Amino acid sequence: MVGAVTQIADRPTDPSPWSPRETELLAVTLRLLQEHGYDRLTVDAVAASARASKATVYRRWPSKAELVLAAFIEGIRQVAVPPNTGNLRDDLLRLGELICREVGQHASTIRAVLVEVSRNPALNDVLQHQFVDHRKALIQYILQQAVDRGEISSAAISDELWDLLPGYLIFRSIIPNRPPTQDTVQALVDDVILPSLTRSTG
């Protein structure tokens, strides 16, 4: 467990897998998503706005769902810098606030993409390896920093903790009329996560 945490903690973020031109296309896609929503987004509009051919877009992303998922993941990757406040509680609060802000901006897109993911195993693999694993690496980095500072023991870290903070906040963000608030983040950190990490392991 400790070895795995340390290995990823040394490299909390990965470089973009996309070329500069592909990154530009994904940025255009994300902008149009925010302006028009998933249902009204078309590959034609993305190609026109990015001054690219539809063939160029489809060659890299064969479906709208794949394009949108890639755009969302890349957008999150660019802003998901692990906080380093000097203490675990503040790091977790900062990360929770980041998740709420970014997921809240794209809640409708996430709902639409999750429907497509449920129908397409290939999309599910992308979601797992490029989104879920990256969120896990951020949490691992934060927890390993806390271990190094002596705030918690590595023995207190369990696999379930990787999903708890991002998983619950994303769930609340995509449920209509129940967005998480700063109080939600604080309660999750103070009442659930920190007690789990600081409990005696015998």
UniProtKB/Swiss-Prot annotation:
GO terms for biological process: regulation of DNA-templated transcription. Residues 19-79 form the HTH tetR-type domain. One of its GO terms (molecular function) is DNA-binding transcription factor activity. It holds the Pfam family TetR_N. Residues 1-20 are annotated as: Disordered. It comes from the Bacteria. Keywords: DNA-binding, Repeat, Transcription, Transcription regulation. SUPFAM superfamilies: Homeodomain-like, Tetracyclin repressor-like, C-terminal domain. PANTHER family: HTH-TYPE TRANSCRIPTIONAL REGULATOR RUTR (PTHR30055), TETR-FAMILY TRANSCRIPTIONAL REGULATOR (PTHR30055:SF149). This is Uncharacterized HTH-type transcriptional regulator Rv1556. It comes from Mycobacterium tuberculosis (strain ATCC 25618 / H37Rv).
